[in-house]
């Protein structure tokens, strides 16, 4: 029985079905896009691996059930599919190998990158195929769909139709995408693995403990950030710093449009709210 489903055009709203009290899972699968794995091992643009929506949800589940485990699967290639053959290839070769009968929960968090007419046309049926495949190979799993930080009318319709057909709970997060919940240029990200970054600077200062304070411009605006480095080099002619270490600086506006830590916290809280998880 749908208890919350208001259709005004293609407004994105929660879909809540009566599946009984939410039982804390033993084993879960998260299928997501950049909000799950965009910063390598964690969601873009959380400042570290403990601050994205998955980490917040995982902590609550582990507190209730220390034996809880989960797996993360990138769904960006499924979002990119332009026909059914491509979708079935992904379902068969990427999704099915990680599905199992002992899964208690599958969280889907895709749809934001379905951004061309051919992708949207394919996704209309693909969203249903995705849920059907999960139900076939993980029959015990409760399925929850989280959408959408970035939205389009056609994808809203496809996601809602698929969720309605299979009685899948839909958690709407579009209302969270606003100032204060997004990341920002200049945000420092701590990676799980060491990496390197190059950045054109206006000036920089070497601080203690191998830290660099870097002043730089993006789009005519001035920014300042401090990063911990393991080593660095300076191309003085090009005024370009290159450093190695675990920390990077957000310099791209599209990356900065993703959730920041506060946005991810609110996404997780919406998940708990819709599923009535204390």
What do the predicted segments below correspond to?
Residues 31-32, 146:
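Short hydrophobic segments within beta-strands
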Residues 68, 137-142:
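A short helix->loop->beta-strand "cap" motif at the edges of active sites that frequently abuts
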Residues 122-129:
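Charged helix-capping and loop-helix junction motifs
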Residues 142-187, 191-203, 207-219, 226:
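Substrate-gating cap/lid alpha-helix
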Residues 1-23, 278:
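Bacterial Sec-dependent N-terminal signal peptides
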Residues 195-278:
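Histidine-centered active-site loop/cap adjacent to the catalytic His
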Residues 27-29, 37-118, 154:
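Conserved SGNH/GDSL esterase-like catalytic core that processes O-acyl groups on lipids
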């Amino acid at each position: 029985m749908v208890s919350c489903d208001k259709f005004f055009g293609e407004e994105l709203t929660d879909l809540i079905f009566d599946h009984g009290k939410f039982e804390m899972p033993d084993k879960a699968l998260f299928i997501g896009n950049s909000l799950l794995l965009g910063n390598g091992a964690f969601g873009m643009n959380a400042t570290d691996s403990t601050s994205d929506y998955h980490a917040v949800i995982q902590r609550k589940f582990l507190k209730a059930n220390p034996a809880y485990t989960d797996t993360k699967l990138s769904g960006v290639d499924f979002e990119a599919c332009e026909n059914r053959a491509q979708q079935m290839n992904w379902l068969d070769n990427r999704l099915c190998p990680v599905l199992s009968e002992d899964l208690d929960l599958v969280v889907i968090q895709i749809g934001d990158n379905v951004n061309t007419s051919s992708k949207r046309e394919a996704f209309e049926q693909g969203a249903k195929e995705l849920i059907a495949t999960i139900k076939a190979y993980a029959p015990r799993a409760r399925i929850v769909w989280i959408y959408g930080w970035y939205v389009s009318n056609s994808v809203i319709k496809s996601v809602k139709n698929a969720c309605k057909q299979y009685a899948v709970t839909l958690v709407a997060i579009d209302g969270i995408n606003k100032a204060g919940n997004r990341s920002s240029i200049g945000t420092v990200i701590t990676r799980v693995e060491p990496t390197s970054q190059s950045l054109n600077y206006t000036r920089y200062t070497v601080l203690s403990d191998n830290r660099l304070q870097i002043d730089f411009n993006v789009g005519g605006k001035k920014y300042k950030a401090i990063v911990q480095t393991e080593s660095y080099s300076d191309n003085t002619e090009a005024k370009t710093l290159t450093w190695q270490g675990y920390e990077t600086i957000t310099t791209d506006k599209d990356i900065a449009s993703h959730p920041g830590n506060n946005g991810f916290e609110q996404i997780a809280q919406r998940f708990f709210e819709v599923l009535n998880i204390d």
